[in-house]
Amino acid sequence: MKIIGEIPFFSTNLGNAYLGDSLELLPKIPDKTIDLICTSPPFALLRQKAYGNVHADEYVEWFMQFAGEFARILKPKGSLIVDIGGTWVKGFPTRSLYHYELVLELCKPIAEGGKGFYLAQELYWYNPAKLPTPAEWVTVRRERVKDAVNTVWWLSLDPHPKANNRGVLKPYSEQCH
């Protein structure tokens, strides 16, 4: 798929990749033309990063500007995959619920102000190389264990998105027979 008026950053026989501000590029993509959107937006971390990240209290509103475009460009059975890490509540050894709030808002019906997505499945990316943060609760006070998991949300505008699990199935072990 080509974006009219834009030069791909690189191309393969599988498609094109574009480099730019997604809020400027997304409106140039025709309606209902994309099968899969896979994104890992900046997480709502406690410390501000050079690449820019939004505070957890503002995250849902910030993400919704992208979500509207995602819903517009996805094919009816297309999928939106969002890899999003958790964060902590400042000053407390408790987790923020911002990524759950985001999924609830994405899955809220359009008539109620949401985007009308369905949650097909939540997956988990285990990353043992993640730093032990926040240090105060993990390495200093030792009240929490290291967070080594990101949630990967699989959403679709249809309860039956285009999918086929045959490429990831593993044979059952002898113990299961």
Annotate each PLM feature.
Residues 2-177:
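Core catalytic lobe of class I
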